[in-house]
Amino acid sequence: MKTDIEIAQSVELKPITEVVEKVGIGFDDLELYGKYKAKLSFDKINEVKDDKPGKLILVTAINPTPAGEGKSTISIGLADALNKIGKKTMIALREPSLGPVMGIKGGAAGGGYAQVLPMEDINLHFTGDMHAITTANNALSALLDNHIHQGNALGIDQRRIIWKRVVDLNDRALRHVTVGLGGPLNGIPREDGFDITVASEIMAILCLATDINDLKERLANIVVAYRYDRTPVYVRDLEIEGALTLILKDAIKPNLVQTIYGTPALVHGGPFANIAHGCNSVLATSTALRLADYTVTEAGFGADLGAEKFLDIKTPNLPTTPDAVVIVATLRALKMHGGVAKTDLSEENVQAVRDGFSNLKRHVENIRKFGIPVVVAINEFVADTEAEIAALKELCSEIKVPVELASVWANGADGGIDLANTVVDVVENGNADYKRLYSDDDSLEEKITKIVTEIYGGKSVVFEKKAKNQLKQFAEFGWDKLPVCMAKTQYSFSDNQFLLGAPEGFDITIREFVPKTGAGFIVALTGDVMTMPGLPKAPAALKMDVTEDGTAVGLF
């Protein structure tokens, strides 16, 4: 079997101008980055912004194994299959972060015969969005430090600066640094640190902004530090929101590429779902909804993280609500949740599938709490057996959730036809009745408690001393009505990554909060979630290379 990159490089790409004609995008609507990549102009976005939106399908998953369960692959294959059965479909995905590409993933543009192309470009620098976000973030850091160096007219307490620098790499050595060393000419020494670019609030802002003016307003509302009197300092106090918006003026425009089967794909923005809200940009999803009859999009990691945030944070910013949610499950992940060691996941174990089904069942129940119908997609792997598949289908039947096998990795659009037909049946039955888990009027404690008890299956929430003090402070500043973005391990419903399946009776501990007032939510930090990942012992980068003619090698 060919590798992902070998498959991608064997495909004869169509010019992007030709690919997007089918959804009503013309040559003058594009800002081209070569033959196969483009940004969509604001003229076109504004032209369609009042059009009636089409149907929205959200793809999510059970709690994953470290390798992931193939949400992007299923999303792409489903979109291709929907087009094949005659539904005008677009896909809206996140763009990959170079850190995980070089680290554990080795690429994140789908897999097999369900990929977005050109995958090498998408996985590396693409159209420069990550660079622009990194630059805007670090320009803010530089301007903040310069303000302090030039007299600190705002009275910023250097011990209480919460804004960090970023880089789009996994680099644990940069988590904690000291800046301003070298004497008076080089600034004032203080502790600082780096996050990965996709954890930057500017990434979240870019993905939630609806236009340039909204982007500028959100940037102005970023809290960067506190004064000596403990009042917050915003970007607007530094008067630099205009400069930051200027840096991002092209990055805010959605990127257009294609799948192997020629489905138009909007790939834009890429916040992580364990430390941010985990969804691609509102602009990309909203525009796809107005250009196509069906839009397929995804939310990062399992439904306890990405889907909850999509439904509670992103959906209120969209022109419509999801008509169906597809939960991706793999037999290997179910067996892992059923107690099987990672080394034994390729061996048949029907009982482990039954035991691990509790994880999938809870995710199904959770999505139904939002009033949205669910379809389960079994992402097929070579090691799957007929007995295991039959057991999973039987268990899904018992909780009355439709389930389809999807072999899009191996068979492309043809491997997703059954899933596409089932999704269309569910969508056209019109049973979706979306409702948020919590209201804006709920306190932060109430919102978190609802997420922990209703979605995670936990017993209660424990707030450490720092978090308790922040709750009081945030209420004084009027931030307590913002949505909550939980920063939690993706591997478990709990904050303990080793507690698999569907645990109950556990507590979730909130150690501190991070205000993301520009993005419009409050991040609650649990466990030991890192905002700057490290590299594994054998990074994917070790297998990467480029040939003399410029062909990429080793992107999975």
UniProtKB/Swiss-Prot annotation:
User: What high-level taxonomic lineage is stated for the organism?
Assistant: Bacteria, Bacillati, Bacillota, Bacilli, Lactobacillales
| Entry superkingdom | Bacteria
Instruction: State the organism of origin.
Output: Streptococcus thermophilus (strain ATCC BAA-250 / LMG 18311)
Database matches in HAMAP family: FTHFS
Molecular function terms from GO? ATP binding; formate-tetrahydrofolate ligase activity
Q: What is this protein called?
A: Formate--tetrahydrofolate ligase
Which Gene3D superfamilies does the record cross-reference, listed alphabetically?
Answer: Domain 2, N(10)-formyltetrahydrofolate synthetase, Formyltetrahydrofolate synthetase, domain 3, P-loop containing nucleotide triphosphate hydrolases
Keywords of the record, alphabetical order, are: ATP-binding, Ligase, Nucleotide-binding, One-carbon metabolism
Q: What gene codes for this chain?
A: fhs
Catalyzed reactions per annotation: (6S)-5,6,7,8-tetrahydrofolate + formate + ATP = (6R)-10-formyltetrahydrofolate + ADP + phosphate
Q: What class of enzyme is it?
A: ligase
Pfam families, per database record: FTHFS
